UniProtKB/Swiss-Prot annotation:
SMART domains per UniProt: KISc
Region feature Disordered, mapped onto this chain: 603-642, 1314-1346
Boundaries of every Kinesin motor domain copy: 15-347
Pfam families reported in the protein's UniProt record: Kinesin (PF00225)
Compartments (UniProt record): Cytoplasm, Cytoskeleton; Cell projection, Cilium
UniProt: ATP binding residues: 94-101
Keyword tags: ATP-binding, Cell projection, Cilium, Coiled coil, Cytoplasm, Cytoskeleton, Microtubule, Motor protein, Nucleotide-binding, Repressor
Gene that specifies this protein: kif7
This protein's name: Kinesin-like protein kif7
Amino acid sequence: MSPKGVGHSKVEESAVQVAVRVRPLLPKEILHSHESCITSDPEERRVTLGNDRHFHCDFVFEDGSTQEEVYTNCVQPLIEAFFHGFNATVSAYGQTGSGKTYTIGEASISAFRDDEQGIIPRAVAEIFKLLDENDLIDFSVRVSYMEVYKEVFRDLLEVETASKDIHIREDERGNVVLCGVKECEVEGLDEVLSLLESGKTARHTGATQMNPHSSRSHTIFTVLMEQRRGGSRAANGSVQILSSKFHFVDLAGSERILKTGNTGERLKESIQINSGLLVLGNVIGALGDPKRKGTHIPYRDSKITRILKDSLGGNAKTLMIACISPSSSDFDESLNTLNYAKRARNIQNRATVNCRGEPDRIEGLELQIKALRRALENRQRSETRIIARSDPEKRLRPFEVDVRKLQAESAHYRTCTDSAYRLLTELQGEGTLNAGQILRVKEWLCGVEEERSGLTSASGLDSGIESSSTEDSTALKRRQAVLNNQDLVKEDWRGEREDYTSQLQAQIQQLEQENTDFLVALEDAMEQYKQQSDKLQEQQDLIAELHSLLAQPGGAGFLHLKQRPHTAPINSLLQTPDRLTPPCDSDVGRSLARQLDVGASVDSSSYSEQTQWDGTHGNTHCESSRKLNRDEDGHMQTTRDKRKSINVTWTKKDIAIPQGPFGGTRTALPQTLGLCHPLGMQFNRRTSNSSIGESSVWESVRGFGGEFCSDRGLLQAQQKIRELSITIRMKEELIKELVKTGKDAQAMNRQYSRKISELEAEAEQARVELTEAQKQLQELEVQGGRDAVDRSKAQECRRKIAAAQSKVQVLKQKQRDTAQLASLSAQSERRVQELERNVQNMKQQQDLLQRRLREESQQKRRLETEMQKGKHRVKELEIKNEQQQKILRIKTEEIAAFQRQRRSGSNGSVVSLEEQQKIEEQKRWLDEEMEKVLDQRRGLEDLEGELTKREEILAKKEALLWERSGLESKKLRSSQALSQDLLTLSSRIESLERELTERNGLLRSGSAQDSQQIRQEISNLRQEKELLLKQRVELDDKLRQGNLLSPEEERTLFQLDEAIEALDAAIEYKNEAITQRQRQLRASGSMLTQWEMNLMAKLTYLSASETRALLCKYFDKVVSLREEERRLQMALAELELRVEEQQNLVGWLEAALERQQLEADRRLTQQQKEHERNIQLLLQQCREQMDEGLAGRLRQYEGLIHNLSKELNFCKIANQELNIKLREMCGPVNLTGEQCKGLNCDSLLLAGAQSRVAEDVKPIIDAERVQKSREEMREPVNAPLPATWRRSSLPTEDQYTMEELRQRAACELPNNRIVQPGMNSTHWSGSTSLPVTRPRREPRRSSLNTAPLYSSSAIIDVRRNPV
């Protein structure tokens, strides 16, 4: 099925569809023998409650219907409508425990097989399947999940959201919109199922007497889809946007407080649930009752009705599934549910296609047409005025060619028309045409004649069909004017059409670009899809194989085990059927006691063999589980704490296999009764046979909870594999983000490393300036600050010191921030490595789960073969059961006949009181004898227990003896090793003594030169001998004392001796107890032999009436015991069901805990991904700001260089002018000798003053330039030059005379050379290097002491001292 294109929006009126689903009887209801009160007829779509209450609906599903049938018949048409743009709703209604959650599909996904999945998983899978089949559709799918608990909204996908943040609104079209609900965009089925599982764990559920997992809130799972269909893009660029939503509503069950037994918080929840359902019933009644049309609909009385406003009488296609219970105890609730459904069928909805793009396009086109019409009318009026004012001759010339072409075409068409006229006239005259053709020819000829007459009257000429005369000049001019108007209009239309065409071409180019992007994204997606399909191919094959195995007949019907989720399937038929076969009976003699002993021994031995075999099989499972756990621990060592739930969940435990449908004590009482008499043995046989006959009933009771236990492990493993796949994908995306962040951080590192070096250089320069300023400040403080200039200099120095210190602090902070940013790449690399390890561990877990899937599938196949064998055995037992049932019926009939005879007195005699007392005495005597037999059997059992305990003690003793023998052998080996070491040491000592003797001989006969060396060797040999002697003494002591083992081993050996001694005492005590038991049994055996003889003798002397009376007494006793057994069995079954429910609850809680951990991990991964994106954005902004700062710094440097170059050029020009003036002033003049001498002195003084001033001013100028350049570097923008700066700032207009210069130089020279007390001669050379700011130069003054550095500032620093 592929979604069709949608044209204009259409409205479809449809009634609310109603489906009734009857659930099967629950195990507890079967146990208490509840009857079904529902009769359904799917063909006639009718449900009958009781005998005379009939209800018709759209769909009827019996208790044997499957989930696939419900989905295919009811929900699949809604999916098609959902794809066509309609809203849809599926709601489940009914009492608590009627199967609403199971039907809607909100139960645990991993707890059911694929054929048991509900509506939501199937619908979502169908949606994504259709989207995959239609690649041309651009779609987006979002899901939301919320609940209404106690009339308060709660977002299940974001539990932290407060209820006040969720509001119900209506848009401009009247559709209900939920504001504040988290909508997660999904791209596949696995993501939807994961969100459904996480929301399900956060839903409010609780246990009541009717349902252990009762839903305590209404839930709404919504799927929202938007489709962008571009089928008409090529025509007009329009895009259709279809938006539709699908509500899956699981209503809380209606509850009777007396039945549920709710109190406290559960009672408050029940009141809220019932009030909400009451409002829903009122809404359904108001909408479904024809008499109440036009009345108020109470949508706002409840939150759930406000949400379902579209679904009930609004813009949606709605399906209501009424879930009912067939039990007769729920008759009233089923009746209320069916009445609800009956009223809901009368509700009419008006479903509309939700298409946003097409109506907007039509409205826009209509507005555009109106605007174009107005523009055309205005243009025509303006053109008419222009034509009236313009020269007609100039405007007619371009159109004369067109007129000639039109006249030629007109003449051609007239010629063709004349030919056709003549031809049709001839055909009409021949009479070969039929009536219809003649009629059409006449109509055509009449039309031609009318046109000819019209042309003749209009032109005023005799213009027949064959004439081709021209029109007169007046008509031609008029027609040409009209044609001119039309041509102008055409030109305007052509211009507008070209504009519109250019717009369309731009849109087409944009769409083509988008299409190219989409194709690239599609190729990437297809590549990823291929990779994922390759990875999951093996898993799909395995799932298909499991499905085929599950589809086989008889698939796990006999697995009645109570086990927790994720446990390995274990066959419940591992027991041998010997427990159900009665012992062979006999009717005579001494063989009775022998049969009792043999029967007891056979029964106990079979039980022990059975227990041993079951234990062996269970141990095998335990060993396999331990092996799997060891493998898992090896693979998951790094994530053990994080994934502890997985290890706990997968722990396989030994399961106690019951010996019958209700455990090992099922046939204990009948067996004890069957030992006193052959007739009692027959009752024993009947009891066992009846229990076998009832096994089918008990299996049906047990089958609901444990029918598919072997499949749960597989399903949950598949669910875990899906969850791991999603988590792995999220981690891989996070790794990509981290890698991208690392690359950006590396790029930033390179930039910041350069910036760090720049900042370090700047900080170093600032430190140097700070040091210089501090030195200058100290010098000024030493001088004492006698004048105002020194004080101002000191203050300036302090300000500069403070500025330099703050600058150093700022630079240090920048350096720290930059280093912190530079460390981002290292952090990203560490996180990438950690995430890669996590992903690797997850992949190992996934491989481990896949291996477990394969192992469990193999184990399942083995169990199925064993089940087949068990089935054959059950068939044999059923055949034997039928035979024994026949015998039982015969005996029962005989007893009934005897009772009738006794009541009717047909035997001719009435039992007297004495005879009754005699029968009672005989009964008591038989009871006493039976107690003796029971004591004998208990003694046999105790003896067997003592023998078993003695065997266990012997086994422990053997183990201890083996361990002690190991230690003793170790001790013996140690003693042998010590003896060998002693022998080696002794031989070594003897060899050393021989060497010493030889060396002493050499020493006496040797020369003086060799004596020193020999003495050294002799001393070494003696030291070695002493060391060996000490070692031999130690070994002798150890061997003499027996210290051959370590202290721990000695202590262990001592403890073993004590334990063996204790076990010997225990074995001796057990032997004595066993001997005493055997003596007692032998004595009781002789007594039993005597009792047998007495019993047979007394039974022989009994009359027929006494025998029958005694038999009736024992029959009544057996019946009462059977009734008691029945009650105990029912109590046991209820306890087993309760235990199974608790185990399911524990499994559900474990799954919820694991889900919460998984959600926390995913939420953390998502937050990390968002954090990495934010980091990337910050890095990008930092890079942009750095680029902008570098560009601004570059512009600033360029402006500074430009200004300095201008200043340099100006200084060069000023220098040249001053040199020229100086040469003019010092030119050749006629002077006397004194004048020349004075002039030479003045010149020398002036030159010296100028040189000294230049030397003093130069460091000040350099410092000022450095300080100014730094200030400009700190400014973010390029500061322009001061407005007072001019090129003519040199003293050109105030020209100094030679006398003034001479006077100024004479004044400045002594001022500059005055040495104050306490100052050295280099004061100015040190002080002038301070970058102080000098006051602006005032105009020429008379006093000489006003400006000591007047000449330097006026000549050099033109920007600070403009004229």
